[in-house]
């Protein structure tokens, strides 16, 4: 059967209209298949121009079935609070935290324009009152002020300990906007940072660290400049690498072996000189004795 369904923008106005068309035939009589069997019968003809359905008319071929009634929930728009676009930007964070629009939580609110339409339920006071209601633009001045106060204070931990607790939200944009150098004072160096770190230690630990920093091991045969850097024969600072340290230790061992060998040679030379002197004296004595025997 041909059924036309007309809707007036609401699912309650389903008005099925039945078109008479015989769907039965006598099964006892055989039906011959001819060329005209494939031609549609006149009752199923096309809709005339004056009877053509408008945009809200749907033509379907189905049995006499009543379509179910569907209630569509209201969809959140840009004007409603708590709307989040695809890019992730929030139009109103305070409305988003204080209200929840869920399609499953709906209540039937009467509408003057038509029957009941399911609308989303607004649930308030879901966030504890202790949390501040700040948006992204109100957070940036607070972060910038805290970073500026860090420059005027040598010990940044004192201001943080005495400052009142204010919870805030940090986004990726505000976190990356502050450079890493802004967390340290402008006049800070690695040496000053190390000294400031030692001031927070106990007295015993501070004394041990100061002794370990002040003590410098000077090996024999090594020279250091005013900055405490190891220098070579030319006065240039030596490279502080593992390979260079191995080379310096090998050269030092070679110098020690050479000095020891030289000392041994000097002792042997002195002994040889004494023996030569004694030998010459003995020769003189032998010659004198020979001369006496001849006389």
Swiss-Prot record:
Q: Where is this region: Disordered?
A: 181-205
Keywords assigned: Activator, Cytoplasm, DNA-binding, Nucleus, Phosphoprotein, Transcription, Transcription regulation
- GO MF term set: DNA-binding transcription factor activity; DNA-binding transcription factor binding; sequence-specific DNA binding; transcription cis-regulatory region binding
SUPFAM superfamilies tied to this protein? Leucine zipper domain
User: Where does the bZIP domain lie?
Assistant: 237-295
Highest rank taxon of the organism = Eukaryota
Any single biological process term in GO: response to xenobiotic stimulus
Record's GO cellular component terms = cytoplasm; nucleus
Spell out the residue ranges making up region: Leucine-zipper.
262-271
SMART domains per the UniProt record, alphabetical: BRLZ
- So what does this one do? Transcription activator involved in the regulation of genes expressed in response to environmental changes and metabolic requirements. According to genome-wide promoter binding and gene expression studies it regulates, among others, genes involved in ribosome biogenesis, and protein synthesis. It may also be involved in pleiotropic drug resistance.
**What binding partners and quaternary form does the record give?**
Homodimer.
Q: What family does the database annotate? A: Belongs to the bZIP family. YAP subfamily.
The miscellaneous remark of the record is:
One of 8 closely related fungi-specific YAP proteins (YAP1 to YAP8), which all seem to be transcription activators of the environmental stress response and metabolism control pathways and to have similar but not identical DNA binding specificities.
Recorded hits in PANTHER family, A to Z, give: AP-1-LIKE TRANSCRIPTION FACTOR YAP1-RELATED, TRANSCRIPTION FACTOR KAPC-RELATED
UniProt name for this protein: AP-1-like transcription factor YAP4
- Upper taxonomic lineage: Eukaryota, Fungi, Dikarya, Ascomycota, Saccharomycotina
